Amino acid sequence: MTKHYDYIAIGGGSGGIASLNRAASYGKKCAIIEAKHLGGTCVNVGCVPKKVMFYGAHIAEAINNYAPDYGFDVEVKKFDFSKLIESRQAYISRIHTSYNNVLAKNNIDVINGFGKFVDAHTIEVTLADGTKEQVTADHILIATGGRPYRPNIKGQEYGIDSDGFFALTELPKRAAVIGAGYIAVELSGVLNSLGVETHLLVRRHAPMRNQDPLIVETLVEVLAQDGIQLHTNSTPSEIVKNADGSLTVRCDGQSDVTVDCVIWAAGRVPTTDKIGLENAGVETNEHGYVKVDKYQNTNVKGIYAVGDIIENGIELTPVAVAAGRRLSERLFNNKPTEYLDYSLVPTVVFSHPPIGTVGLTEPQAIEQYGAENVKVYKSSFTAMYTAVTQHRQPCKMKLVCVGKDEKVVGLHGIGFGVDEMIQGFAVAIKMGATKADFDNTVAIHPTGSEEFVTMR
């Protein structure tokens, strides 16, 4: 007999889990279909393990770059990479347990299998043993997330992707990270800090090109200072496996790069191609992203989508969580106008040092408001944590303001501790704070964040 639910999520990542937990709190009968591990990309091969690796790299930096000038004579006889991985995976396992406990408490059924639409209200699930079962629901959420992109070039199979990075059991001596986005920059920083000879290959003139120019310029400066070898205007045309097991990355018009490990970090694609969207009549664009309106509705009544798979979305875990919860509020808690405002979403890149940003870059503000209506404030200093050492690191910040009242429409920073500064400022900017509001806030000294309220 086919089991019927009020609400089903295909995909047990952050967005699906958040939406179902909220729906269940209103007494709805829910099920989540997940083919791999609960938590999706974020918990298993994304935010969580990435942040653990960031912290591990941070400790290595403290020992190697800063400890001597703070009076610590530290000698690390051995770095046990396997211990770091063991600790990381144990932490992830505890998160899995927590998810299972919360879902069980909320009486949400967890169906371990691969879900595929049969029609607009029916999903066929292929279980681990190969058997199939069908479930139906009044409301279905597509939350299948994304997967790493690999280019179609000769030898691409010799490289690993970001998922493969988190499957490494030992560190390579030399690595080439291919990509210009935040994933590539973050992985490069981790590898370099842990002692790997690291090459970062980007297609154009710099990584993170969509960031504010001040951030991009400073990032490039720090990459060079820290020893990451940046290869610009480098588009791989072939990966060659050599007799000694090493890999050579060949780029048109550029020098070859020979390493022990190649990591593809050149973007992600939506995991929507095998879930039978055509059977339900759900529309996607030419790249497989699901078309939705501001309420997360697809073109098919009763089918919704959140997270990395939606067209023109923001591929961040908190965005999927927020959209999923608001969707359940609208569907099951009598809030028909509830939706997520996708503007002014704060973001952080866990580079070395980290980047934090919310709102418009200076070029974006000029394009939107006109140069005559934009005023920019900047600050440049050395992070105090590093200022007392020989390994000084820059910290740079910018406020982008518009109009006579100088409304703050953009805030950007790169430097030690910036990742933990941005959240509160995002609240202020979301509320419409002006430069005068920032000026009227007493600074906390000595901190990096005080620069945002003392710029002139």
Swiss-Prot record:
Q: Which InterPro entries match?
A: FAD/NAD-bd_sf (IPR036188), FAD/NAD-binding_dom (IPR023753), FAD/NAD-linked_Rdtase_dimer_sf (IPR016156), Glutathione_Rdtase_euk/bac (IPR006322), GSHR/TRXR-like (IPR046952), Pyr_nuc-diS_OxRdtase (IPR001100), Pyr_nucl-diS_OxRdtase_dimer (IPR004099), Pyr_OxRdtase_I_AS (IPR012999)
Under Gene3D superfamilies, the record lists: 3.30.390.30, FAD/NAD(P)-binding domain
Cofactor comment in the record?
Binds 1 FAD per subunit.
Question: Pfam families from the entry?
Answer: Pyr_redox_2 (PF07992), Pyr_redox_dim (PF02852)
Q: Where in the cell is it found?
A: Cytoplasm
Record: residues binding NADP(+): 180, 183, 186, 203, 209, 267, 315, 348
Reactions mediated catalytically: 2 glutathione + NADP(+) = glutathione disulfide + NADPH + H(+)
Its principal location?
cytoplasm
Q: Which domain of life is it from?
A: Bacteria
- Name any GO cellular component annotation: cytosol
Keywords, comma-separated and alphabetical: Cytoplasm, Disulfide bond, FAD, Flavoprotein, NADP, Oxidoreductase, Redox-active center
Top-level EC class as recorded in UniProt: oxidoreductase
Q: Which positions are catalytic residues?
A: 445
Which residues are listed for glutathione binding in this entry?
14, 99, 325
Q: Which cofactor does it need?
A: FAD
| Annotated function | Catalyzes the reduction of glutathione disulfide (GSSG) to reduced glutathione (GSH). Constitutes the major mechanism to maintain a high GSH:GSSG ratio in the cytosol.
Please state what the protein is called.
Glutathione reductase
- Give the source species: Haemophilus influenzae (strain ATCC 51907 / DSM 11121 / KW20 / Rd)
